[in-house]
Structure formats: structure tokens, C-alpha cells
Amino acid sequence: MKKVFVGTVICFSIFLLTGWSLAADTIKIGAFLPMTGAVAAYGQDANNGIQGAKEMRPTVLGKKVEYILVDTKSDKIEAANATSRLIEKDKVVAIIGEMISGNTMAGGPIAEKAKIPVVTPTATNPLVTQGKKYIFRVCFIDPVQGDIAAKYAFNTLKARKAALIVDKSQDYCVGLGKFFKDAFIKLGGQIVAETFCVTEDKDFSAQLSTMKPKNPDVLYAPNYYSPVALFTKQARELGLKAPVLSGDGAQADELIQIGGKEVEGVAFTGHFHAKAATTKLAKDFMALWQKKYKAEPNAFHALGADAYFVLLDAITRANSTRGEAIRAALATTKNFEAISGRLSIGEDGNAVKPMVIMVVKNGKFDYLTTVNP
């Protein structure tokens, strides 16, 4: 009887060490993404990218991956609720999401408390990972993005006077605007106007009437695609011809659909362009995408897929589905050959990786250059 009891304890201990999910037929990975609402384009594209990645690699540790998606409706409260559901009801071992910083920060603390790792494809605000052990990202952070954008404006566009329009309702936009502003001033530039909006705004006449008399050399709009498109369109209609520069939030097809020919020439910092792809994983992913959709993948497709691949790499190296083990593996990701380029992730949860600069040209996103870390 004693031998049976000891054997049971040993088996149970091994079971705990390797993770509960290993006893199941599948390994559950969740995602909380904005499939509807103001930034639905990001979530829909990332989800398609994840589905493509899952098609390329449907198993991990010898088991099928079960992918569970919950719509955040582009809302912070819904993002928190989605995170709770994935952890408490669906019993996932890790989570992908969210796409924007504010929503990621709404769900992050819940996952942190439960010790469930989260990998965000595109939440770039530094606060997303600050002070967290279980939150990671496969994108660059806004201080880097703002600095590169300021250098591009100052050195390439030869801008000395910048005007800003910042979406004050979004953490991402506020942070990126500040980082650009600080970097531009440090370079010797001047901020001649700083105006604000919210994501739902459609009329930017008040902001433009403040900017135009200042005769700026560049207009920096660190916002999501809809306000960037509408702002640019109205700026051109008002006769304000200064170049418009934005961040990674602008890279959605909807920017061109909403802005039309008026967004020609809009440049922005971003994560991925097919012309800049160099890794084998990128080439394999693009081949899959071409076969399925007869098109090139965009940044949100690529980063959604990267989040999935990085998670599976961590689970494989950990040889476990325990949250603590996956977290430790994520924090020691070194030179992973991702779709968006070679990346490393440290204990701070942040990815060190290349950045690309793109421009709208002939109704498409055209590649300009790559900036390496």
C-alpha cells in the first residue's frame, strides 16, 4: 500500500511539473482580439495571420493546438472580460493579444495574476510590459518608433517645424506623440502646434485651422488608420500640403480605402513589408498567403503569426504548458527568425528587432527602408 502511494505521488508530481494541459488531447492557446469596433481591421488581419501560422504549424509537444478566439469589440472592458473568460472558462495555457495598447493593458493584469503568458502582436506602448513578468510583445516599442520617426522627419524630410494631432483617447497615440515630440525637439526641431482628437472624430477643421497659420514642414499623426485618413484628406482639401508622417497604427488597407488619393505620400514607421522579408519563415508564410489569398501579407497578418510562432517556440523549449515555464522560455528568446525579422525578447518582455519605413504610393504601401536595432 505504501509503495502504491509513493508511486502515485511521484506520478502526480511529474504531471504537475509538465503541465495540466499535457494530459489533454489538445493544447489550448487563446486570443483576445478586436474583431468588431473601431480597430476591427487590426484584429481581423491578425486573426487571419494566426490561422495561417496554425496551418503551417498545427501541433506543439506532439499535440494539436486548439485556438480559441474572443472578440474584444475594440473596448477595454470587453478586453478584460475576454481575458478572464479565456483563463477561467477555456483554460488556455497562453494568450495572444490584444492589438492596441490600452486594451492589452486592460487584460494584462488579469493574465499576470493568473500567471498565464500573454504575447501581444502590436501593442507598442512601453507601459504594456513595464513591471510585468507575464506580458510580452513581438513588436518594437514606441520610444524607438518615435525616435526613428523624428529622425526621418528631421534628416530625410528636412523638416524643422512639426505640427501634431494626437488621439487623446488612446494610450498608444498619446505615448507615441510624446516620444516623437521629445526626439524632434532634441534634434533641434520645433513643435509649432500640438492638437488633439478622439478616435471617433470625423471633422478636423478646428485642429487644421490651428496648424495652417504655423506653416509646418511636417504633420505628425501618431493615430490609428481612420483618423489619420480623415485628417490627411481634410488637410489636403484645406490646402495644407506638408508631408504627413504616422506610426504603425496607420498600416491598414482601410487607410487607403478611407483616404483615397489624398493619402498618397503618407509615410509611417512599421513592422513588416514583403519587400523587406528575409527569413525562411517569412518566405514560407508569404508563399502560403499567395496561395490562399493571391496577395502579399501585411504587417498585422505577419505579427499575428509571429506571436503564434514565438509562443510555440517557447512552449517547445520549455517542454511544458505550465505558465511559469512558458514565461521563462519567452524571456530567453534569442535571435528567433520571425516573419517580421530576427527578434530577441528579454526579461522586460520587449522585442529587439528591425523596423521598416513605408509610404503610400499608387494606392499601395511601398517599402522605403529598414532600420536595424
Describe each model-derived feature in a short phrase.
Residues 30-49, 57, 70-77, 99-102, ...:
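Extracytoplasmic "Venus flytrap"
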Residues 1-28, 60, 372-373:
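Short, low-complexity disordered leader/linker segments with a strong preference
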Residues 41-48, 56-129, 138, 197-204, ...:
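Beta-alpha junction/loop-to-helix N-cap segments that form part of ligand/metal-binding clefts
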Residues 135-199, 218:
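An alpha-beta-alpha
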Residues 232-305, 316-319, 359-361, 365-372:
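Extracellular/periplasmic periplasmic-binding protein-like sensory domains
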Residues 111, 177-271:
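Extracellular/periplasmic bilobed ligand-binding domains
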Residues 42-57, 78, 118, 145-149, ...:
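Short, solvent-exposed amphipathic alpha-helices that sit
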Residues 291-301, 312-364:
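Segments of small-molecule ligand-sensing domains
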